[in-house]
Design a protein with these regions (language model features):
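Glycine-rich, proline-tolerant flexible connector loops at the mouths of alpha/beta enzymes
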Residues: 37-63, 83, 87, 105-122, ...
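Hydrophobic faces of well-ordered beta-strands that scaffold small-molecule active sites
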Residues: 17-23, 38-40, 77-81, 104-106, ...
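Alpha-helix-loop-beta-strand connector modules within alpha/beta enzyme cores
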Residues: 3-4, 51-79, 116-141, 183-209, ...
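C-terminal alpha-helical cap/extension of soluble enzyme domains
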Residues: 200-250
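Glycine-enriched alpha-helix->loop->beta-strand junction motifs that scaffold or abut catalytic
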Residues: 34-38, 45, 97-102, 135, ...
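Catalytic cores of alpha/beta
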Residues: 26-29, 79, 84-96, 206-220
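N-terminal amphipathic alpha-helix/helix-capping segment at the start of soluble metabolic enzymes
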Residues: 1-20, 24-32, 125-131, 137, ...
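Conserved anion-binding
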Residues: 101-165, 244-250
């Protein structure tokens, strides 16, 4: 499905909600519930395949899951490619095209080297990917400035770096910026204002702003990350515990 349709759904204040999937069947459930786009969660995909997150899964396996999803659903798919699996921009673009992906997330922590990329380094990667894909791919630039931030004060301290990176990534051609795991509504609102009118992706977290607040803040896209996978896993675990106790799991 086309990147054009995915791009059109990024409207500040009317956010695209993405309940992240991890295989073809969970993707089907997303579509059956009426959501217009499927997104993958790299952590959930990796866990379903028996790996830890952080590019422990091979690119072949990850892109195989993506291809299975696009074959199973008739809505656009955006793929979480972590930091790129050590692939060149051309290789990454080719693999996404082969999987018929309409979009991708690319994070600025280099998982292969275990370090944060510099602003210029990550902007260059994004520009290279966009040069190869053009408008055929919606690039969501994930910004890791808030990961590990200690409460609202820590998030506020991380805000200038996040804004600097967002502006550089947008200048490099990113279609959307994703300051992952911001829990402070005030800080997230300031981030949205600083990069306006660019689309901003927010994470829907149990201890963060709810859907109504995220909409009010003007974000254009909301990801659940591993949220659905964790819920599914918890339900299965509870059913197994009941069965082990000799009671009905149903």
């Amino acid at each position: 499905m086309t990147a054009r349709r995915l791009r059109e759904l990024h409207v500040p204040g009317e956010p695209l909600v993405l309940p992240n999937a991890w295989d073809a069947d969970s993707a089907r459930l997303v579509v059956e519930a009426g959501f217009p786009v499927v997104a993958t969660s790299s952590a959930a995909v990796a866990a379903a395949l028996g790996y830890a997150d952080g590019e422990q899964v091979s690119p072949d396996e990850m892109f195989d899951v993506a291809a299975r999803i696009t074959a199973a659903v008739d809505v656009p798919l955006t793929v979480d490619v972590e930091s790129g699996y050590g692939l060149s921009a051309l290789e990454l673009a080719d693999r996404l095209a082969e999987a018929d992906a309409a979009g991708c997330n690319i994070e600025d922590t280099d998982q292969q080297e275990g370090r944060r990329r510099s602003v210029a380094e990550h902007a260059a990667l994004l520009a290279d990917v966009k040069r190869h894909c053009g408008d055929l791919l919606v690039v969501n630039a994930r910004i890791d400035s808030f990961l590990g931030a200690d409460g609202p004060d820590g998030e506020r301290a991380a805000l200038p770096d996040a804004v600097e990176r967002a502006r550089a990534y947008l200048d490099a051609g990113a279609d959307c910026v994703y300051p992952i795991h911001v829990r402070s509504a005030e800080v997230l609102g300031e981030f949205v204002t600083e990069v306006s009118p660019a689309p901003v992706n927010a994470t829907y977290l149990p201890d963060g702003p709810d859907l109504a607040m995220l909409t009010k803040l003007g974000v254009a896209r909301i990801s659940l990350g591993t949220g659905l996978w964790r819920l599914a896993r918890a339900r299965i675990s509870a059913a197994l515990s009941s069965l082990a106790d000799g009671t009905s799991p149903f």
